[in-house]
């Protein structure tokens, strides 16, 4: 934060290991705290290129701009499979289209190349 340079997060993570839950949850708390402290001070930009689930899903919600890859990107706190009747063929609540059009958590959806290009333009 001292230099005022933007923070850019490129996310693709299958989640945390239960064996490391306490340490991982503490790390999430530290990340969230630093994001909140940086809010309004420096730009925060997130690109989701694969799975972004569980506690990691809070990270893009705290950033200023969120980009998501349109075919492989998935964003969820609880697995979409945990919702009764949520079949991908009916409605994939973790998809880029859903997160952008219905949830409002994603600002830009596109291919990996498009997203990286738009992130460069934004910076």
List each language-model region with its residue ranges.
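Conserved catalytic cores of soluble enzyme domains
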Residues: 11-123
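Residue-level signal for alpha-helix termini/capping positions
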Residues: 1-2, 36
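Residue-level detector of intrinsically disordered, flexible termini
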Residues: 4-5, 33
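Glycine-centered short loops/turns at secondary-structure junctions
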Residues: 3-4, 41
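Serine endopeptidase catalytic core focused on the charge-relay Asp
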Residues: 8
